[in-house]
């Protein structure tokens, strides 16, 4: 089942995706809710980011192919060392944008690239859970684009600019609840040309392991998001580009790129 968050005429709600229609949900998606008879064509509404998370986590260097690409292009010694450890970090929730929104390239940045990823959507509070318990705490999955600037900002002591600048967190278009995350393709396209494709089967730390490890020290709340890593190579984005992140079982997240 696919759940979308949308806005029409200033009113926001959740809905279940039924073909090219949205069937409105009344109540709390993460609690008690029911389906109504109200429907809207998808093309008549604004699709919003699928949740409003309290935290937006990310796992870096989670695929061997991506590690190899980064070693080739960045600080090889540091990348090789970091890739051996589980190193989650937080992407600022203020950078989140949704389907069709614009990625803005900061005037000060000199190299901004995409990172198409699978995103975990937490469904209920999770604290000190095991990998085996993790599926029951996950509502579903969506597409994400971990927009990053690795140019002159690469050596920043934190990710505050290179990972969490405004608009650097596209996510959507909706949540798929019926998905086995262990072997799905992640496809990234720029201006219609495929630039990266990989499978979640190549993850070093799988989705259930990731949720479990983070929950040992941090309570995850309903609607929280976790980026699970880019599977392969990345390329620079330019003003006017259209970047798509597609996971066939979920849908396609599409955003246009513009200069500040």
Give the role of each language-model region.
Residues 77-128:
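Hydrophobic alpha-helical segments and helix pairs
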Residues 1-86, 179, 189, 193-194, ...:
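N-terminal non-catalytic cap/leader segment that marks the start of a structured domain
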Residues 52, 58, 98, 113-115, ...:
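Residue-level recognition of short, solvent-exposed, well-ordered loop/turn junctions
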Residues 62, 119-144:
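RNA pseudouridine synthases
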Residues 46-48, 76-78, 103-112, 126-133, ...:
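A generic local secondary-structure boundary/capping motif
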Residues 55-57, 86-88, 94-95, 102, ...:
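Structural motif
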Residues 68-70, 99-102, 107-108, 129-134, ...:
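A short secondary-structure junction signal
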Residues 46-50, 66, 148-260:
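Catalytic-pocket segment enriched in acidic/His residues
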């Amino acid at each position: 089942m696919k759940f979308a968050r949308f806005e029409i005429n200033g009113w926001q709600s959740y809905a279940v995706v039924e073909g090219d229609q949205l069937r409105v949900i009344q109540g709390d998606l993460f609690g008690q809710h029911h389906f109504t008879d109200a429907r809207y064509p998808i093309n008549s509404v604004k699709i919003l980011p699928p949740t409003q998370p309290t935290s937006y986590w990310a796992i870096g260097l989670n695929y061997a192919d991506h590690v190899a690409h980064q070693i080739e292009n960045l600080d090889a010694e540091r990348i090789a060392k970091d890739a051996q450890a589980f190193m989650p970090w937080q992407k600022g929730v203020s950078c989140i944008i949704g389907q069709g929104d614009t990625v803005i390239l900061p005037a000060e940045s000199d190299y901004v690239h995409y990172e198409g990823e699978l995103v975990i959507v937490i469904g209920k509070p999770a604290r000190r859970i095991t990998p085996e318990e993790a599926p029951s705490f996950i509502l579903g999955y969506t597409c994400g684009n971990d927009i990053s600037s690795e140019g002159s900002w690469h050596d920043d002591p934190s990710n505050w600019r290179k990972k969490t600048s405004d608009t650097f967190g596209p996510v959507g278009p909706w949540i798929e609840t019926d998905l086995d995350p262990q072997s799905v393709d992640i496809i990234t396209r720029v201006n219609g040309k495929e630039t990266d494709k990989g499978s979640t089967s190549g993850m070093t730390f799988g989705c259930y392991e990731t949720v479990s490890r983070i929950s040992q020290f941090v309570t995850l709340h309903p609607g929280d998001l976790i980026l699970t890593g880019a599977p392969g190579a990345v390329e620079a984005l330019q003003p006017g580009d259209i970047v798509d992140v597609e996971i066939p079982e979920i849908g396609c997240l599409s955003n246009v790129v513009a200069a500040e």
